[in-house]
Amino acid sequence: ITPVITFHHFTTPEWLYNQGSWLNPKSDEYFNNYVAKLMKELPKEIVYFNTINEPGIFAYFGYLSTNKFPPGIANETKFIIASENIMSAHKKALKTIKEYNSNAKVGMTHALQEWEDDDDNKLKKYLKYHLEDKFLEASEDDDFIGLQTYTIVRYPKSILLKLFTPLLLNIGVIRKFILPRIIQIFAGRNGAMTKDTRTTKMGYEYRPDAVLYNLKRLNKRFPNKEIFITENGIATDNDDERIEFVTTVLKNCLLYTSPSPRDEAL
């Protein structure tokens, strides 16, 4: 068993929360100090370090979407500030970890879903970038990528969404307040699912092949990095369904590592 240390998994200390949480301009320094303190105590035999778990998720649900994670602000400007501080914290921590352990391999674990093909969907492009791609940009200097995927993101086939989203995204003063509500109404994971769509107990569309989609995606972007599947699974109380899901995921992993071309789908 190879241990992997995770320094941050959603929980923010109350003292930092009371000082503005990730909106605090010193939050990245505070996080780096915390990492340095732990590195002084951790044995050198530990090699793998994950600085932040799913940075896009806790930034999005805490600062852009409504009423999911604390502080539940739902303001685009603050979401961008928090995201920048989170990415800065990761980059500083990466350097600090390597100063204490020259053999360290450092990365982040990213929540990456399969995205429904719809290149004309402006909201899809906006969310995919701010939830996933910009945090992948912050991983350019990382040693490994942690992949955490569960489902596909779909969108309602709404004419209103097509018409008004581009307009909304160009109205700077209004959008920072209205955009979170629009996202909440139109862009949930359930998107365009029908009553016949197979789902898990979490309400996610049953999508074990989403792993293969993201393995290809990551390999295309980071061909020389280690890629670990650090989270995956299904919420179910049916063991047969669980076995089916896990078996399909493993088959997709074998397909990914086979000699056949890996990037044709992306």
Model-predicted regions and their roles:
Residues 1-93, 102-116:
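Substrate-binding cleft and catalytic face of glycoside hydrolase catalytic domains
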Residues 1-3, 41-46, 89-104, 137-143, ...:
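A structural motif corresponding to the C-terminal end of an alpha-helix
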Residues 21-28, 119, 238-251:
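Short, electropositive alpha-helical surface patch
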Residues 34, 38, 86-89, 93, ...:
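A general structural detector for well-ordered alpha-helical segments in enzyme core domains, enriched
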Residues 54, 111, 149-150, 266:
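Flexible loop residues that form catalytic
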Residues 76, 87, 139-239, 250-254:
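Glycoside hydrolase catalytic-domain groove-lining segments
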Residues 108-141:
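Substrate-binding cleft/loops of secretory-pathway carbohydrate-active enzymes
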Residues 256-265:
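Conserved small/polar residues in nucleotide/adenosyl-binding loops
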